[in-house]
Amino acid sequence: MSPLHRAIHARAGELAPALAAFALLLCLFSGYFMLRPVRETMGIAGGVENLQWLFSATFIAMLVAVPAFGWLNARVPRRVFLDWVYLFFASHLLAFAWLLWRIPDPLWTARAFYVWLSVYNLFVVSLAWSLLADVFDRQQAKRLFPAIAAGASLGGLLGPLAGGLLAGHLGAAGLLMLAATLLLPTLLLRRWLMTWRATDGAGRPGAETEPPERPVPGNPFAGIGLVLGSPYLLGICAFVLLLTCTSTFLYFEQARRVAELFPNRTQQLRVFSLLDFTVQALSLACQLFVAGRVAQRFGVTALLGVVPLLVALGFLALALLPQFAVLAVVMVVRRVGEYAFIRPGREMLFVPLGAQRKYRAKNVIDTLVYRGGDAMSAWLKTLLDAIGLGAALVALVGAGIALAWSLLGWRLGRWHERGITAQEVGP
């Protein structure tokens, strides 16, 4: 075994697929994080006081997109489904590139792009993890997912760096075209991974899995029914809702503070880029050197339960010392924890499930539930501000939510570790 095998806990024959999965996430996140700082400045351009409307618009867009996703999923073989979705989104990136080239600084194009990129991000990432949960079996996922997730963090490092270096030469339209180009290698990687799956992965001879040559059956709303009929999936839904609530509280406070302290758009872009770079660098280090060891020694329970507890402590620190520096540290801890620990742990929860739940139900949770939680949390934060609760009291509310999030994370982790019964999964 090579040092790299040992570093990522790969066994014989697993290094190549782990690297292919790593590269797939690297391409996706490099493209997205080139565009994320652009999205943040566009959100502020419309007014921080209007962010809740953008969150609501994103949720409404999800209400349309999720049934369309389900309709296509029932008609396209699982083996090539990712190709169809990614080519669809690549065409939209090119369309927005043309719009930004023709109309360089329109307010409504900026708002539309903010909403669209929020939809794009969740769909392409959710589908990539659905693919990986389909390719690797339960034990392979537990060993390899933390290292594979490092591809996302490396992409999060390279994306802003490339965006910063190329923005002056290519402009926003050129960056969108480059992001569309980065989707193309993922199609080749998907094909190779599905071939490996049939011989050495979750679909190897003797494994009880559904063949990927057929579409995932069900009507366009089947994913919603699967979620509502499963205590296990409803638990994951509640976990995601609590995650989005803490995230949105911090996000709104960050946007408000950045708008106050850095009124210039160029300064705002630099602040967001610096925060993104810091988050991704720390996430990459944790994914490569910490998360895998935590998963091996303490299991999914630790991946899901510890970070929310740290976020609760961060909210308490904000209540005592409501400074931008403290907020930035809490924001970094939350995002690093999500990328390095919670995301791999959350994806492991889906590995034992069937194809319908990996693709249909998972997509509903990762998109509709996630953005619904964003919208609900945005209006809750707006309500708390409107009734005159100070920043300290809002932070205390956030701490309480984070504690509930931690308790549910421990519960889901223990559920997964002991094995899920058919009754808990649902009919």
Q: Regions from the language model: what does each represent?
A:
Residues M1-L24, V48, R75-V80, A90, ...:
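Intracellular loop-helix junctions on the cytosolic face of multi-pass helical membrane proteins
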Residues P17-F69, T109-L165, P212-L226, L243-A291, ...:
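Substrate-agnostic recognition of the 12-TM MFS/MFS-like secondary transporter fold
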Residues F59-M62, Y86-L93, A180-L184, T244, ...:
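Residue-level recognition of pore/gate-forming positions within transmembrane alpha-helices
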Residues V66-V85:
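Conserved MFS/SLC helix-loop-helix module at the cytosolic interface between two early adjacent transmembrane helices
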Residues P67, L94-W98, L157, L184-W192, ...:
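Membrane-embedded alpha-helical segments of multi-pass transporters/permeases
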Residues P77-F81, A162-T181, L274, G299-L303, ...:
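A membrane-interface helix-boundary motif in multi-pass transporters
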Residues L87-P106, L309-Q323:
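C-terminal ends and interior cores of transmembrane alpha-helices
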Residues A302-F341:
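C-terminal transmembrane helical hairpin of 12-TM major facilitator-type secondary transporters
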